[in-house]
Amino acid sequence: HQLALATQNDLLEATLDLARFSTPEARDIAKIGLANYFAGASLLPYRAFQEAAKECRHDLERLADRFGASIEQVAHRLSTLQRPGAKGIPFFFVRVDQAGTITKRHSATRLQFARFGGACPLWNVHAAFETPGKFLRQLAETPDGVRYLCLARDVSKPAGAWRAPVRRYAIGLGCEVQHAAEL
């Protein structure tokens, strides 16, 4: 997102000027969000990425290889393909740390993440830490009766500081079962 902040600041500011923020901090958070979205859209352009996703039936590893992106970047981008007239499968995306805290989330589905507390302990995203490098699949049903196909996998990120431990997360990607035939 640093590149977006450095090269697209005028565009970001013009977009932010269209909104009414209650605090300067809220505006700053929104600016980072826009810069992150810009970065993802630059790395994984909408139409080319959407076509590739359909072509390989949304295979996260193949998409990551094809676009030189991480599994997490690919999963997150899939959850944002909701442009009017060119919508992709409505996916949800989640990233959790080893304590079970949701650290990143996005949903184009009816699934709503809890604002407080943890996610269901039976959800496969929690078991992903036990099977490094492997995708876990799960059929899950929410209390409102909606059924989801859920994928989960562990991911690691360098901490950045000298000798700092590697940060481990699990990512989850899912869609309503009615879309499973497209995967």
Language-model features, listed with the residues they occupy:
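Conserved binding/catalytic microenvironments
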Residues: 1-183
